[in-house]
Amino acid sequence: MKFFALTTLLAATDSALPTSHPVQELEARQLGGGTTRNDLTNGNSASCADVIFIYARGSTETGNLGTLGPSIASKLESAFGRDGVWIQGVGGAYRATLGDNSLPRGTSSAAIREMLGLFQQPNTKCPDATLIAGGYSQGAALAAASVEDLDSAIRDKIAGTVLFGYTKNLQNHGRIPNFPADRTKVFCNTGDLVCTGSLIIAAPHLTYGPDARGPAPEFLIEKVRAVRGSA
């Protein structure tokens, strides 16, 4: 998406980009990261992974893992083995369009239903699997809304959730409603305005790569091992 189109859409949702923001840096986020993973939806129940990671990308990001998801996936696979963890991005009805950020829950109802369906699949396909989740920007709002809306029996199977640039951080008091705070890790950079109730995109919103390569997956790995043991 070109910078002009992006700023026009943001203006339509009562948001604006700082004029000092570098065009190329913004486009690197919006156009980069085209990885798609559908291990859960394509997987066979006879060969379930012990761990299933469900992730929602940020607005306009390509693939279903966007820019941050692949880094988390790589670290999880190093910890649990390629066959030990399934990676599943949220696609389908989740279009990651900019306008949906202005909706009451920070994303569309259709997107929430899509992610809810992914959380529900393992209940029949891989009932013994441990679930972990994450999301970036609009995807963080989507992950939070989906986890909040789950039946408690399925929600209790989620060992941990990581949220980057959480667009509902202020509104939800830095947590996911109806979900334990100790199983939630929110990454909000200093100066990331979306974490303080705005939809203005500033440079700190685009610099969560180091967190996705280190602290975020490490948190998830720790939470999984607390449930399943260190094996």
Curated annotation (Swiss-Prot):
Catalytic activity: cutin + H2O = cutin monomers
Active site residues according to the UniProt entry: 137 (nucleophile), 192, 205 (proton donor/acceptor)
Function: Catalyzes the hydrolysis of complex carboxylic polyesters found in the cell wall of plants. Degrades cutin, a macromolecule that forms the structure of the plant cuticle. Allows pathogenic fungi to penetrate through the cuticular barrier into the host plant during the initial stage of fungal infection.
Transmembrane stretches, start-end: none
UniProt GO cellular component terms: extracellular region
Compartment(s): Secreted
GO BP field: carbohydrate catabolic process
The EC number(s) this enzyme carries: 3.1.1.74
MF terms in GO: cutinase activity
Site feature (Transition state stabilizer) residues: 59, 138
Pfam family of the protein (one): Cutinase
Matches recorded under Gene3D superfamilies: alpha/beta hydrolase
Homology family: Belongs to the cutinase family.
Post-translational modification summary for this protein: The 2 disulfide bonds play a critical role in holding the catalytic residues in juxta-position; reduction of the disulfide bridges results in the complete inactivation of the enzyme.
Entry keyword set: Disulfide bond, Hydrolase, Secreted, Serine esterase, Signal, Virulence
Disulfide bond annotation, renumbered to this chain: 48-126, 188-195
Record-linked PANTHER family: CUTINASE 1-RELATED, CUTINASE 2-RELATED
Chief location of this protein within or outside the cell: secreted
Gene from which this protein is expressed: CUT3
InterPro entries found in the cross-reference section: AB_hydrolase_fold, Cutinase/axe, CUTINASE_1, CUTINASE_2, Cutinase_monf
Class of the enzyme per the UniProt entry, highest EC level: hydrolase
Cell inner membrane among keywords: no
Signal peptide segment: 1-16
Protein name (record): Cutinase 3
